[in-house]
Amino acid sequence: MRRSRVPGAGLASWTEIDTGPIPGGGALRLVRRDEEFLIAVDGMELMGSHRSGSERELADLACGALRDHPAPRVLIGGLGMGFTLRAALAVLGPQARVVVAELVPAVVAWARGPLAHVFAGCLDDPRVEIREADVNRVIQSGPETWDAILLDVDNGPHSLVSRANDRLYDSWGLKRARWSLRPGGLLGVWSGCPDRQFKARLQRTGFAVTEHRIRSERPGRTPHV
């Protein structure tokens, strides 16, 4: 995802396609300009159809480690525009199961409607299950359930859409994630910028941390992590 102020004339130069309420308050907006789509909140770009490098890299790094696993179970927090999901499916084998938890129902509806061409049929892949649910609750559904959990939720450890998402990244949230991972499991987290405090929380929770900095597709932007 990209969390930045919409450049130029802002959203005034974009055509609104739809809005979707965020549970707990606020709304997401789906807007279009020519062939480019954005999902935005409060004038801030959350994700765009023309910039997806860090989302794909999140899946490549985590799921690449599962390439030889016979039947991995992967949880993706946040559907977005499907870039993480598509990248995961490209790496994982035919017996994999990928569950995507998306809190905002409109995002799922857009994936099957005006953004269907962006998703390129990945929601119909038999390995995929979409749950309209808080990924935090899915994580709490049972111990040693997942071989990998990929979180591209909100703005990473610094919430933008909903402060409730901070629960994923605080100490208790990380402990729950570790509890729900199988032995040797991986937690992949998208972040808009490096965060030493979050890295320290991961380490205190028992995770071995490797940080990957991905160059932003916009010149001059802070690398994504």
Predicted regions and their residues:
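A generic short-segment signal for beta-strand/edge and adjacent turn/coil regions
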Residues: M1, R5-G10, D42-E45, R97-A101, ...
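Active-site capping/gating segments
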Residues: P7-E16, G20-P23, C193-V225
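Bulky hydrophobic/aromatic packing residues
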Residues: G24, F37, L46, W110, ...
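Loop/helix-junction capping segments adjacent to catalytic residues or to phosphate/diphosphate-binding pockets
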Residues: G48, G82, R196
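The AdoMet/dcAdoMet-binding core of the Class I SAM-like
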Residues: S52-L181, V189-G192, T205, T210-S216, ...
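Glycine-centered, phosphate/nucleic-acid-interacting loop/turn motifs that mediate DNA/RNA or nucleotide
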Residues: G185
